[in-house]
Curated annotation (Swiss-Prot):
The keyword Nucleotide-binding does not apply. Specifically methylates the uridine in position 2552 of 23S rRNA at the 2'-O position of the ribose in the fully assembled 50S ribosomal subunit. This is Ribosomal RNA large subunit methyltransferase E. It comes from Coxiella burnetii (strain RSA 331 / Henzerling II). Gene3D superfamilies: Vaccinia Virus protein VP39 (3.40.50.150). The active site is at 162 (proton acceptor). It is found in: Cytoplasm. GO terms for molecular function: rRNA (uridine-2'-O-)-methyltransferase activity.
Length: 212
């Protein structure tokens, strides 16, 4: 069985896919974030959040539901995303200066401090089926997400990012730890068991220029 056929069969039988359709989420990924929030209380009312690689919008929808009407959710992705009530969407590459400047300007306009409380990323590379290639590309996306987060995250804030397990992840964690009081790996039950994806949860940001 090819990788594509196996994925399609699993997708059709996946209880989280069925649940997402029933409950109105654009993807099963919403349940990963909900599970993490239930355990670690990521979101609070009135929080300001950036969702990197947001399409199709499952995480943005969860975030907006949890931060409420006074909270701000800014979603960004290369791909288009269906419009969501009270979610600000930017289509583009946040690594490009023009797009990042647009993101920074929105954060400055919508927040009192020009910073956000939470940066989340469920980004994954286009899957080639070659494990080492996919893992390396995933780690690169994580590094880009962190580069963005460190510029816009408020002190005391939280960074949540997906990565595929493999070479370089432990080194990234070592480099990340000095900037946060808490850093841990997570594997939500909504993640497929055979998937190498894990999440890095880094809490209580010390500030990019204030690391210990």
């Amino acid at each position: 069985m090819t990788h594509s056929k196996r994925w399609l069969e699993e997708h059709a039988k996946d209880p989280y896919v069925k649940r997402a359709k029933k409950e109105g989420y654009p993807s099963r990924a919403a349940y990963k974030l909900l599970e993490i929030h239930q355990k670690y209380k990521l979101f609070k009312p009135s929080m300001n959040v950036i969702d990197l690689g947001a399409a199709p919008g499952g995480w943005s929808q969860v975030a907006k539901d949890l931060v409420g009407p006074k909270g701000v959710v800014i979603a960004i992705d290369l791909l288009p995303m269906q419009s969501m009530l009270d979610v600000i969407f930017i289509q583009g590459d946040f690594n490009e200066p023009e797009i990042f400047n647009q993101l920074e300007a929105i954060v400055a306009k919508k927040t009192l401090t020009g910073q956000v409380d939470l940066v989340i990323s469920d980004m994954a590379p286009n899957i080639s089926g070659i494990k080492n290639v996919d893992q390396s590309r995933s780690l690169h996306l994580v590094e880009l997400a962190w580069d963005c987060a460190q510029k816009l995250l408020a002190r005391g804030g939280t960074f949540l990012v997906k990565v595929f397990q493999g070479p370089g992840v432990d080194r990234f964690l070592i480099n990340l730890r000095p900037y946060f009081n808490q850093v841990k790996f997570l594997k939500p039950s909504a993640s497929r068991s055979r998937s190498s994806e894990i999440y890095i949860l880094a809490g209580e940001f010390l500030g990019y220029n204030q690391r210990v």
